[in-house]
Amino acid sequence: MNSGKILIVSSTHGNEINPVWSVNQYSKQGNIIDKNIEYKFIIGNPLAYEKGCRYIDKDLNRSFNLIKNNHDTSIYEIRRANFLVEKFGVNGSEPCDIAIDLHTTTANMGTSIVMYGRREKDFCLAALLQHKFGLPIYLHEKDEKQTGFLVEAWPCGLVIEIGPVAQNFYDPKIINRFLIIISSLREEINKLKNKQKQLPKLVIVHVHQGSIDYPRGEDGNINALIHPKRMNQDWKPIKKGDPLFMDMEGCTKSYNGKNTLWPVFIGEVAYKEKNIAMSYTKKEVINLPTQICEDFFN
């Protein structure tokens, strides 16, 4: 970390409003700056936030792979992605070393961490939070249909995902969880920097394997919904024969695979347009070399 600044992004999706309230409350309490690390707060997609919609033209959190040499100013989210990188990127006018992207979900994900790829500094931050709070980690990788995430535009970054909460609905419990994470993150980094804390030797992650669409008829319309026994069961294993969907006649469509899966984002409202009913993962234990802590501040 060279600048000692961390970018905290809220409302990357405009209808996820609890993070905005959280950072405003945190700021008013005088917690923006300490002697070691400075937080920079920004609303990711302010126009979508004003309108209460997820995005204007395109999902901002799928736009950061499109900004290089892209001069199409007609797409609001690409303009916004360019602005964020030009201002807060490592070579920007107000450079930040780390980006933390705050999100809410309608799925029963609890408080969780999302990582994109296997960058060592990301593992370092994720391990600190998992060790302190026991948070599950969703490692999203190797999905060609899902790319261009905000935190990938910084050398280190994580998504904090909290749910369930409805879109455009304030929930004090959700807000409080964000406040705890925002406060604790800086404390943990300071402890690590001052050699007051050791990195855990391992981290447990749920590695993305793919996504499942709703069953559909020949007309392309959804003809079965998530099974009642599967709803709200994020992070809980699915084994062969377990129910996944139920159609209008009450018939169950079950999982027929051999391997145990761990589902995430079950029934996420925003993913319906992406033809995703849920994503599924496998568990992996990753050993963390002590060297990544030393490299974190270089």
Curated annotation (Swiss-Prot):
Protein name: Probable aspartoacylase
Cofactor: Zn(2+)
Family per similarity comment: Belongs to the AspA/AstE family. Aspartoacylase subfamily.
Protein's UniProt keywords contain Acyltransferase: no
Coiled-coil regions listed: none
Residue positions binding substrate: 54, 61-62, 161, 271
Organism: Prochlorococcus marinus (strain MIT 9515)
Keywords per UniProt: Hydrolase, Metal-binding, Zinc
Catalysis performed (reactions): an N-acyl-L-aspartate + H2O = a carboxylate + L-aspartate
